[in-house]
UniProtKB/Swiss-Prot annotation:
GO cellular component terms listed in the entry, alphabetical order: ribonucleoprotein complex; ribosome
Organism: Halorhodospira halophila (strain DSM 244 / SL1)
InterPro entries documented for this protein: Ribosomal_bL28/bL31-like_sf (IPR034704), Ribosomal_bL31 (IPR002150), Ribosomal_bL31_B (IPR027493), Ribosomal_bL31_sf (IPR042105)
Database matches in HAMAP family: Ribosomal_bL31_2 (MF_00502)
UniProt keyword terms in alphabetical order: Ribonucleoprotein, Ribosomal protein
GO molecular function: structural constituent of ribosome
The name this protein goes by in its record: Large ribosomal subunit protein bL31B
UniProt-listed GO biological process terms: translation
Length: 87
């Protein structure tokens, strides 16, 4: 196997920003932020918007998380409104 072609596989903390839930796992994701975990060691931190703790499929609750999607930006840019147009 060739050396130095694969990203570093390391322990990383993922933090769900909507529920403040964090979990430690392994990943190749790159990040500049770090956090001190419960074991006293410092790990890279990745902030995510949705995890199993906040996703409606896993929680059974409907929750509106709107961060302004591409469709809204398109409609705003081209002056389109919702509904049918008159012909």
């Amino acid at each position: 196997m060739k050396k130095d072609i694969h990203p570093e596989y390391r322990e990383v903390v993922f933090q769900d920003i909507s529920t403040d839930f964090s979990f430690l796992t392994r990943s190749t994701v790159k990040t500049d932020e770090t956090i001190t975990w419960q074991d006293g060691n410092e790990y890279p931190l990745v902030k995510i918007e949705v995890s199993s703790r906040s996703h409606p499929f896993f929680t059974g609750k409907q929750r509106v998380v709107h961060s302004g999607g591409q469709v809204d930006r398109f409609r705003k840019r081209f002056g389109m409104t919702r509904g049918s147009s008159s012909q």
